[in-house]
Amino acid sequence: MSDLVKVTLPDGSQKEAPRGTPVIDFVKGQIGAGLAKAAYFAKLDGAPVDLSRALDRDARLEIVTTRSPEALEVARHDAAHVMASVVQKLYPGTQVTIGPAIEDGFYYDFARETPFTPEDLEKIEKATNEAIKADLPFVRSEISMEAALALFEGMGERYKVEIVKDIAAKGAKTLTLYKHGDWVDFCLGPHGPSTGRIGVVKLLNVAGAYWRGDAKNAMLQRIYGTAFFDKKELDAHLAKLEEVKKRDHRRLGPQLGLFTFHEYAPGAPFWLPAGTVLYNVLEDAMRRLVLKNGYQEVKTPLLFNKRLWETSGHWGKYRENMFLVVDSESDPALALEDRCSFSLKPMNCPSHHLIYRMDKRSYRELPVRYFTTDALHRNEASGSLGGLTRVRQFEQDDAHIYLREEQVTDEVLRIFELMKVVYGAFGLGFEATFSTRPEQRIGDDALWDRAEALLRKSLDATGLKWTLNPGDGAFYGPKIDMLVTDSLGRRWQTCTIQLDYAAPERFDLTFVGEDNKEHRPVVIHRAIYGSFERFIAILTEHYAGAFPAWLAPVQARVVTVSDRFDAWAREAAAALQARGWRVEVDGSSDKLGAKIRNAQLAKIPFTLVVGEKEVEARGVSPRRHGGEDLKTMPLETFAELMAREATAPF
């Protein structure tokens, strides 16, 4: 074995180094001090490693600097370790559990009987930033599972012991530890060179979290925080968080009269008049779009016998997420679960399969596209419910497409075209992820191989960049998920395209081919909005409640200088309403300034001022939401403006 290893750099050039040279020493000696100073971690043959890792083989080397978002993610994980060490120092007896980096920050879950207070958070944050300044190195080591178990048992860390036992049960022989100062934790890494490289930490809030996400387990305290290399970047992020709070749909929804919730129906929104208008506008727009693109609308029952779910596989794989209904004719002596022969449908696909199966199908008919907005019910854990983004009752712009295998790629491209129209209308950016087979699934590996290969080919044909999300597919097939980006740069999962070879087998779905023989179709499950509830939450925050004129529950409000102009105000509103616009009149006795201010607070796209000159001109003086005044114009001219700006774009 040679004493030298070949190191291939990103530009393709190669250098040699003595075997065992730490990455950081190689960078200092053969690339430059500037890169070494900026380096945070490295990648060897694509795998992330610490800068202290030895070059023990020929490999491709990439240095990740503090200019990279990937470095910031590692720094945030570093910050989680430092914060956890501080918490245990300040509050002896606190148990540590897990503490990953997450998008825009990090968290760590602690087991402690006494709740953390806002004052505690300030104290922890100050001590964390002081610990960072100590510039302690992160030291990596590997120990046997037996030694790891003895270590954490000796420390009294029962949650860590549980995790170590689980890792050992999966066949692992060693465990990676990271230590800074006298505090140690296990994780895969990598970590930065030392605590001093982390930057500045800000702790955000404390929330409850069940151990391992299971409500049957102990409730822990989760401290959320974030970290940035530069304080200016942190300040900008905190300003963004303040804007996020202002836009929170849970705040704006009730404020704008869109929706509310009640304890008698947890997880099921009450749509108020304004919200119902918004909901219906979105639904009607999608309906128009899909019906002119070859879809047929159907409606199916909400309640089904369990035999349907046994056929589909949901009874065995998804029952814990279903609302079960007792059969009134069942034996009262049976256990409650055994008396539940029915359930509310958690998804539409099985009932659509029944419709498809009702007729003999020819290859000439395919694709057959069924669309619905039926209500669905899923028994989500109460602790996971949150506003409109996680609910128990919802509707989707749901469609199921039955087609031949060779039609799949073209159909996926058609769906992407619809998606571009919809997301483009709202100014939402988007990107794709490809999710492959999960551990819990139906269908054999051969079917999954075909399904994944075909959906991957279809995704490649769209020309979009995408990322792999292994193991996150539906239990019946792989899927493409779309992540839309809102006006604050946040990503939300919405559209899904799922490929299903299993359902045609389970439901005995067929079509007669050109050879006059029966064949199995392929099924595509797809939704573009996702759920209406979640999409409305996204749009509410995207627009900060100031919806575009075509979508706004009230498109224009007429306000008068005084009540002597009420007659023309009502006549003008009625004329606009007759053309289909959503217009109302402020008939209050408030002064004009208050009326305008109230319309602005209600985020109505157009406020139409009516006074003496408007009555004489039989017109209005429009003011856009946000304050832009338009000149006085005849009512007909404003109606033409509405036709341009308030007509649904799809």
Swiss-Prot record:
Its job: Catalyzes the attachment of threonine to tRNA(Thr) in a two-step reaction: L-threonine is first activated by ATP to form Thr-AMP and then transferred to the acceptor end of tRNA(Thr). Also edits incorrectly charged L-seryl-tRNA(Thr).
Enzyme type, top EC level: ligase
Record has Cytoplasm as a keyword: yes
Required co-factors: Zn(2+)
EC number(s) on file: 6.1.1.3
Biological source species: Anaeromyxobacter dehalogenans (strain 2CP-C)
Keyword tags: Aminoacyl-tRNA synthetase, ATP-binding, Cytoplasm, Ligase, Metal-binding, Nucleotide-binding, Protein biosynthesis, RNA-binding, tRNA-binding, Zinc
One cellular component term from this protein's GO annotations in UniProt: cytoplasm
Annotated localization: Cytoplasm
Domain spans labelled TGS: 3-65
Positions with a binding annotation for Zn(2+): C349, H400, H525
Homology family: Belongs to the class-II aminoacyl-tRNA synthetase family.
Family matches, as SUPFAM superfamilies: Class II aaRS ABD-related, Class II aaRS and biotin synthetases, TGS-like, ThrRS/AlaRS common domain
Record carries keyword tRNA processing: no
Entry protein name: Threonine--tRNA ligase
Manner of cofactor binding, per the entry note: Binds 1 zinc ion per subunit.
One example GO MF annotation: tRNA binding
